[in-house]
From Swiss-Prot:
Keyword Ribonucleoprotein among UniProt keywords: yes
Protein name: Large ribosomal subunit protein uL23
GO terms for biological process, alphabetical: translation
Entry similarity comment: Belongs to the universal ribosomal protein uL23 family.
Organism this protein belongs to: Borreliella burgdorferi (strain ATCC 35210 / DSM 4680 / CIP 102532 / B31) (Borrelia burgdorferi)
Protein encoded by which gene: rplW
Domain of life of the native organism: Bacteria
Length: 98
């Protein structure tokens, strides 16, 4: 896979912002088939920084109920499952996209 296929998007939330500022951890939404080595290589290629370590989490899909305007359930569905990557960098390294 190419680097742009592995890294889907950065995750920008309050929790990820505090982690980025305090312990220099960046969080990305990644391809479900990517592994740690591929994620590390993609970060190195795209942002020109060398990650110290990388942790991956599989986020399971959740059941959802589609509700009509009157409040009646009219169908059931699921959200998509996805994968999250925590990328640890050295203190002096930064990623400029954030």
């Amino acid at each position: 896979m190419k680097a742009y296929d592995i890294i889907v998007s950065p995750m920008l939330t309050e929790k990820t912002n505090t982690q980025r500022e305090s312990i220099n951890v960046y969080v990305f939404k990644v391809n479900k088939r990517a592994n740690k080595k591929e994620v590390g290589a993609a970060i190195k290629e795209l942002f020109n920084v060398t990650p110290v370590s990388c942790n991956l989490l599989n986020i399971k899909s959740k059941a959802k109920v589609v509700v009509s305007r009157k409040g009646y359930p009219i169908g059931k569905g699921k959200t998509s499952s996805w994968k999250k990557a925590y990328v640890y960098l050295k203190k002096e390294d930064k990623i400029d996209i954030f």
